[in-house]
């Protein structure tokens, strides 16, 4: 049987780059970055591939026998399912645990004996909820499917003998909200990696959305376009990976797969020097803009006029000014669309020298650059700007007028293309003869290259990206995750899939807005016969562009409801994917051995929890909206509906976890307290149920190709989140229902601390916020409970019965389990002392002993000194 590695795509890109970067199975160690970047291991032949078997042999055999004579498109991806030797025990364990849970519920209700009946009632309700939420999480995982793009087949089909391409157009969206919280250098590296991707330059365009309206981002984009004339041909000539210069130049010993090794050293040195100068220019932009503006403002004739911010061409910037005034401040400014790089002329433009004047030999290298556009949508206090969804919809409309590509892929500004073949990999799913026409979007896993080696706060989230998402791939497809996702433009427009689509669809102004050019572009998109084309430059077109990105264009249209990205919910990604799936579209999950995209994640605990609050709060908002999975999505498959329901209610679980986690305070009660009697049988039931869930987890680990550390980090951070971020989100939702105020959107800061010598300085900085109070209470309660338990043991060991000793042992076991789960939080409290984790290992037993001694001393004091 062929392994996934032996059948993945191969071939060369348009500049002769080898197939070393072709997509295979995703590697467990491929979230890499900087000097610590590791080679992607695993792949199809590793531990991850051996549990998967080809699922499309019959289809491939039929396609091969047909030889393409039926005129249909070829098979462009391969499907794999978990082998029966692993899948059948996995399913059996799920059913067995379900039966065990039901028996446990029945037993608890029949034996409603407890020392604290209100707590017994709450614990039973919690157990029922745990079982229900576990079932919602587990049912969609019955049929995991891995889909691998076949780049060789795509090249044979789309790369024609005359040098032209059959590839469709792609518009790439990059969104940034603030140049301070999201550093400009990150954003420009994202743009450079997009411009250098292996895709025909005349069929791709890049749009940067700047939600701050700041001149610095526009001028940084202009500088980036200049540097791209050197960087992009350099990447093509030498097959550079990754194509983000910051990430590439951090590599200690990058492997070389190009065809000109004798020129590489000199070329790399020159480009590196140019990149350093490019960074200096970016860093100097704020001061450059300020000095220029001061010069122009000093020459104004009306001294009472406000101090404007001036562009390099001597005109006033229409966006946010350094000294903000009405109509020129963040949150209130005109819409801006500026074409930084126009559409390249068709045909190969070969050059011996790059435009910067450096003597680099780019002979036989295509030096053209894709279209590059700056977009800053208009904002007005009288209109809701709808956060990221509003910015994406403005890009969607502007791109419709400029390039109107059939497919769209969006990135957060802190991500970059790690594998230049990524666009082609996604296109494999869109053009495949089986599901291509019904595929609305292709989601890639999120990978991060700035996470600490031990992944203290579970940023990699492998359980979700390598487990849950593959499971959804076997249903109607993965959910949209906000970045690294390719969309079919028609699906974003709210058009039904071909099977349900009506003939002769007429775009209406009431739905898409009052723009004739936009309505015409929708008709062209329906014909699916247009890719990126040169943009018109007449005044009418410019006015139309400014109108479609204005603050009021969405008003009284279907934008944000049935068209584009959905508004009024903090997690616009999940609800947008839900709306598209609900129309009958499917989605696909694309993994590549050398990860398609990499980004940065918040490694500071507080920043990470703020991110979780927004995600979980948005999920609850979705449940209490008309997009509730119980009532919405008329064409959702049943298990896909179950999956979305789980995504919207999971934060509620935290309330019962918090109840259990704080229950050890009962150790402080002098008398014995039993939650459930008979206690021994209760504990046995719990142990069996917990053991079974970890056996299921062990099988998931095997077919998902992750490690026990990945699994354990997921468990730990879920516990931290369940005592902090998730209850906060539930509280926000209650406030929202009472006051109609939504979840506040807080941009996750990507800035590191001033300690530039420590890559993980943010990891060791503790920023106290109110949501951490419950977690601290739980930690202190369990530390105190363990100490008191030790003290009680010392006092009562001689008189305790065996049952009492067993009760104490089980209580201690629970306390220690909670402590292990909160271990990352304890490290966070230690700050920089956490660099030596042995300190915590030594400190905790000392604290336990101190608490025990205090308890013993108090007991002696109360028993022998203070009379009653």
Swiss-Prot record:
| Purpose of the protein | May catalyze both beta-1,3 and beta-1,4 glycosidic linkage on beta-D-glucan. Essential for (1,3;1,4)-beta-D-glucans synthesis in grasses and cereals (Poaceae). The mixed-linked glucans (which are not present in walls of dicotyledons or most other monocotyledonous plants) are particularly important constituents of the walls of the starchy endosperm and aleurone cells of cereal grains such as oats, wheat, rice and barley. They can account for up to 70% by weight of the wall.
Indicate the residues that form the catalytic site: 211, 573
Q: What is its EC number?
A: 2.4.1.-
Is this entry keyworded Repressor?
no
Q: Which GO terms describe its molecular function?
A: cellulose synthase (UDP-forming) activity
Enzyme class per UniProt: transferase
Q: Which cysteines are joined by disulfide bonds?
A: none
Q: What is this protein called?
A: Probable mixed-linked glucan synthase 3
Quick one: where's region Disordered?
36-68
Name where it mostly resides: Golgi
What species is this protein from? Oryza sativa subsp. japonica (Rice)
Q: Which Pfam families match?
A: Cellulose_synt
Indicate how the chain sits in the lipid bilayer: Multi-pass membrane protein
Q: Which InterPro entries match?
A: Cellulose_synth, Nucleotide-diphossugar_trans
This protein's GO CC annotations? Golgi membrane; plasma membrane
Q: Where is the composition biased (Basic and acidic residues)?
A: 53-68
Q: Where are the transmembrane segments?
A: 86-106, 116-136, 649-669, 686-706, 717-737, 771-791, 810-830, 838-858
Q: Indicate whether DNA damage appears among the record's keywords.
A: no
Please, one GO biological process term? plant-type primary cell wall biogenesis
């Amino acid at each position: 049987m062929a392994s996934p590695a032996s059948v993945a795509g191969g071939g060369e890109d348009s500049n002769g780059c080898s197939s070393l970067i072709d997509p295979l199975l995703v590697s467990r160690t491929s979230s890499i970055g900087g000097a610590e970047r590791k080679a992607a291991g695993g792949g199809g032949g590793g531990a991850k591939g051996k549990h998967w078997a080809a699922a499309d042999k019959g289809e491939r055999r039929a396609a091969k026998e047909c030889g393409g004579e039926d005129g249909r498109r070829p098979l462009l991806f391969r499907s794999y399912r978990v082998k029966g030797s692993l899948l059948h025990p996995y399913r059996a364990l799920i059913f067995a645990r379900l039966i065990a849970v039901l028996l446990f519920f029945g037993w608890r209700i029949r034996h409603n004996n407890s020392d604290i009946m209100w707590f017994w009632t709450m614990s039973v309700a919690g157990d029922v909820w745990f079982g229900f939420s576990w079932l919602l999480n587990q049912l969609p995982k019955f049929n995991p499917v891995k889909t691998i793009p076949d780049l060789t087949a795509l090249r044979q089909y789309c790369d024609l003998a005359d040098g032209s391409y059959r590839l469709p157009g792609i518009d790439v969206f990059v969104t940034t909200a603030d140049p301070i919280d999201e550093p400009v250098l990150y954003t420009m590296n994202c743009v450079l990696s997009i411009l250098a991707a292996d895709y025909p330059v005349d069929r791709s365009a890049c749009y940067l959305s700047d939600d701050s309206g700041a001149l610095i981002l526009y001028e940084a984009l202009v500088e980036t376009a200049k540097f791209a004339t050197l960087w992009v041909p350099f990447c093509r000539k030498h097959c550079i990976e990754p194509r983000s210069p910051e990430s590439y130049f951090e590599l200690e010993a990058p492997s070389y797969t190009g065809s000109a090794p004798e020129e590489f050293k000199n070329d790399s040195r020159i480009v590196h020097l140019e990149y350093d100068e490019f960074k200096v220019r970016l860093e100097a932009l704020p001061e450059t803009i300020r000095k220029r503006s001061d010069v122009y403002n000093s020459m104004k004739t009306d001294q009472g006029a406000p101090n404007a911010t001036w562009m390099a061409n001597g005109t006033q910037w229409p966006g946010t000014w350094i000294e903000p005034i009405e109509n020129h401040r963040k949150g209130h400014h005109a819409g801006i669309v500026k074409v930084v790089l126009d559409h390249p002329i068709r045909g190969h433009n070969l050059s011996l020298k790059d435009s910067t004047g450096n003597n680099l030999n780019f002979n036989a290298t295509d030096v053209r650059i894709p279209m590059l556009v700056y977009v800053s949508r208009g904002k007005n206090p009288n209109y809701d700007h709808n956060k990221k969804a509003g910015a994406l919809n403005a890009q969607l409309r502007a791109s419709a007028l400029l390039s109107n590509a059939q497919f769209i892929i969006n990135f957060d500004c802190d991500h970059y293309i790690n594998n230049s073949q990524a666009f082609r990999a996604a296109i494999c799913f869109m053009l495949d003869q089986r599901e291509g026409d019904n595929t609305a979007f292709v989601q890639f896993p999120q990978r991060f290259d700035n996470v600490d080696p031990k992944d203290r706060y579970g940023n990699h989230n492998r359980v979700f990206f390598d487990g849950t998402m593959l499971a959804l791939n076997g249903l109607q497809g993965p959910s949209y995750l906000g970045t690294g996702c390719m969309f079919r433009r028609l699906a974003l427009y709210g058009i039904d899939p071909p099977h349900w689509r009506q003939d002769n669809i007429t775009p209406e102004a009431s739905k898409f807005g009052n723009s004739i050019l936009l309505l015409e572009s929708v008709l062209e998109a329906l014909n699916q016969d247009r890719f990126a084309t040169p943009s018109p430059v007449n005044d009418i077109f410019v006015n139309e562009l400014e109108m479609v990105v204005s603050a009021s264009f969405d008003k009284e249209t279907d934008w944000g409801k049935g068209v584009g990205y959905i508004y009024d919910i903090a997690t616009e990604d999940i609800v947008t994917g839900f709306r598209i799936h609900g129309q009958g579209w499917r989605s696909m999950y694309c993994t590549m051995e050398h990860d398609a995209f990499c980004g940065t994640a918040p490694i500071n605990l507080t920043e990470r929890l703020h991110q979780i609050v927004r995600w979980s709060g948005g999920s609850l908002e979705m449940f209490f909206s008309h997009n509730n999975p119980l009532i919405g999505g008329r064409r959702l498959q049943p298990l896909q509906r179950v999956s979305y329901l789980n995504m919207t209610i999971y934060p509620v679980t935290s309330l019962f976890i918090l109840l259990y986690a704080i229950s050890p305070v009962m150790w402080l009660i002098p008398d014995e307290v039993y939650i459930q009697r008979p206690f021994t049988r209760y504990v046995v039931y719990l142990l069996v149920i917990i053991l079974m869930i970890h056996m299921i987890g062990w099988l998931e680990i095997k077919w998902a190709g992750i490690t026990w550390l990945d699994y354990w980090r997921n468990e730990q951070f879920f516990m931290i989140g369940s005592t902090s971020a998730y209850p906060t989100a539930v509280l926000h939702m209650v406030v929202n229902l009472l006051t109609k105020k939504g979840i506040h959107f807080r941009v996750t800061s990507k800035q590191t601390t001033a300690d530039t010598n420590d890559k993980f300085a943010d990891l060791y900085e503790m920023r106290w916020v109110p949501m951490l109070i419950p977690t601290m209470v739980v930690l202190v309660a369990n530390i105190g409970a363990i100490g008191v338990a030790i003290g009680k043991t010392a006092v009562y060991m001689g008189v305790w019965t065996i049952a009492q000793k067993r009760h104490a042992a089980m209580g201690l076991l629970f306390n220690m389990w909670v402590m292990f789960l909160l271990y990352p939080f304890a490290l966070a409290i230690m700050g920089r002392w956490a660099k030596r984790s042995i300190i915590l290992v030594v400190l905790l037993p000392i604290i336990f002993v101190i608490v025990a001694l205090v308890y013993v001393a108090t007991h002696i004091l109360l028993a022998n000194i203070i009379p009653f």
